From Swiss-Prot:
It comes from Brucella melitensis biotype 1 (strain ATCC 23456 / CCUG 17765 / NCTC 10094 / 16M). Its EC number is 3.5.2.17. PANTHER family: 5-HYDROXYISOURATE HYDROLASE, URICASE AND TRANSTHYRETIN-RELATED. It comes from the Bacteria. SUPFAM superfamilies: Transthyretin (synonym: prealbumin). It is an enzyme of class 3 (hydrolase). This is 5-hydroxyisourate hydrolase. Belongs to the transthyretin family. 5-hydroxyisourate hydrolase subfamily.
């Protein structure tokens, strides 16, 4: 069976992004998001368990929401009253229930990058 995982790296400090709040949503055909999980990254910037695995893995559209402003404020970063990046949504599709989907996020208070990992 496949699985979904993530890994968040803080490129401003050169460290894993520990204690970042992440939410996983499944997007219904109507476009309505359904909250599946709320997690917090561990000391390695990962989740302690896959976000989806086994019977939870279904084809469809999903969205990960990363609470980056909250994370950087917790690290003591001086952010504007309206931070440039607050919440980063990454919407993606799962086409193969048996596939491994890894969604890394490399992030600073001013930029981010993602890709499909393995």
């Amino acid at each position: 069976m496949g699985k979904l995982s993530t890994h968040v790296l803080d490129t401003a400090h050169g460290t894993p992004a520990a204690a970042m709040r992440v939410e996983l949503y499944r997007i219904a055909a109507s476009g309505t998001p359904e909250l599946l999980k709320r997690v917090v990254t561990n000391l390695d910037g990962r989740t302690d368990a896959p976000l989806l695995s086994g019977d939870e893995m279904r084809t469809g559209i999903y969205e990960l929401q990363f609470h980056v402003a909250e994370y950087f404020e917790g690290r003591g970063a001086e952010l504007a009253h309206e931070p440039f990046l607050d919440l980063i949504p990454i919407r993606f599709g799962i086409a193969d229930e048996d596939g491994n989907y890894h969604v890394p996020l490399l992030v600073s208070p001013w930029s981010y990058s993602t890709y499909r990992g393995s």
